[in-house]
């Protein structure tokens, strides 16, 4: 009989343990949502569910939400706390007027909650796709997380306004890009501003040229991370590191200037290829164990430009900043040298977006002709992409780096349907992707120009636009840019231009006829045209089918022979293999799950009761 009791106890405890473990989640990712680290989150996920643990410096309520824009309106919110020793959690949403409503469908499940003298901790989970119109679907794209807290719990009278205890942070919850650690004591050098005076305005982009340290032999950079001056965590919004022309004048080194200013030195314009990108809240980028960025050889970067975006909405004066980047490097060489290929739309005034458009699509082609010639010559077996940076400016809303082989579309290299200009980092790929000679790539960008009165032009300023994907790959080949640009003639024909003044002696060039555009530059003519959303849509459809000019350039000023060729956009077909969000389930299926759980619980209790009577 004692053996039967022991057997029953083992069965019961094993069943209980298994049912408990199935609900457990390992929090492998974490982030501080504010600069003072008062609000911290951890999370983990599987193919259908995400689980959060939040720790906040308060004994009152805490709010956590997912927003389409980073603002309060139209957000998916959960509010909870610990009141009189009992944790609570409620699912809310806000309407377009920011009014808070309790969600009829409570899709967030409270797992546990506790508090001490200073902090509140809550853990909760939800499905990635809840099938609730008031909840946001969580995907691999950028997620704008909003947060708030208050010193008091939610009482009978409802929520108390949180005041200034609030904020937002963009994260990639399903693609956080956790990298491997590097050995302690790894050597490093810093690229750091020296007491730069931050102007008395809300937004400033500061550029400075640096020279990499001279190396007697080849080394590999294995990690790059931000150096943010203490107290400036909310001031320094993002940092970009560009490779410059290796023939840059040495007198430019350590010279700083406001970026994109009319008086910015021309030499700064040679710094185009992004080597690294960091955005507020990020923790840097670590190269895979078999790859590093080569420095110290004749073909490696020598001069670089550091671009820092200062965000000063309160217009504080008298600020000086010494932020920058730290690059860790090692003489222990890895198997492969990393390279960067810039793909997308060639930055030019020929890239133009009509005003007033809620969804305008631009496509930049890295053509099969360019990849065929360059990779056949340098690496016939292809190159492996391990990280991607998707890049646009303020009008950008979504970007996808599409991949084709023999005109058949494969899975995208990277995609972000909720692009945030202020959150740009290299996204490590979960699996490396092979690019073969003859493959082709399309960087597809979606823009919103609603509220703009004139054309938006391709250019360097943040009010101008870009559509680029920077691919980190190995082994390095001599291919720096693989881009395209739609021909201008077809774009001008749309607004009725029939002739330009020749010879062309000015830029932008001047229109000759018809009379209504005579002696206007082509940019002035485009602005003069009476755009409507319908006309903008027709223009978009035409531009995407126009012949395009191919850019296929090597490092420096050299070019592959394909550069300048005029080709038509390829006819491609989709394989329909894109990863879909978790499908909504019928209520009956959910009820069945609950019934099964209740049945399992009843069985366990029956086993226990039987054991007690043996």
From Swiss-Prot:
GO terms for cellular component: endoplasmic reticulum membrane; extracellular space; secretory granule membrane. Glycans are attached at residues 116, 249, 454, 519. Its main location: endoplasmic reticulum. One of its GO terms (biological process) is dopamine catabolic process. Its cofactor is Cu(2+). The keyword Glycoprotein applies. The chain crosses the membrane at residues 594-612. Residues 1-22 form the signal peptide. It is found in: Endoplasmic reticulum membrane. The active site is at residues 205, 391. It is a single-pass type I membrane protein. Binds 2 copper ions per subunit. The keyword Calcium does not apply. It comes from the Eukaryota. Cu cation A binds at residues 237-238, 309. Disulfide bonds join 207-259, 244-271, 366-482, 370-552, 445-467. Residues 37-150 form the DOMON domain. Cu cation B binds at residues 391, 393, 466. Gene3D superfamilies: 2.60.120.230, Copper type II, ascorbate-dependent monooxygenase, N-terminal domain. Its EC number is 1.14.17.-. Residues 23-593 are lumenal. Keywords: Copper, Disulfide bond, Endoplasmic reticulum, Glycoprotein, Membrane, Metal-binding, Monooxygenase, Oxidoreductase, Signal, Transmembrane, Transmembrane helix. Belongs to the copper type II ascorbate-dependent monooxygenase family. This is DBH-like monooxygenase protein 1 homolog. It comes from Danio rerio (Zebrafish). The lineage of its organism: Eukaryota, Metazoa, Chordata, Craniata, Vertebrata.
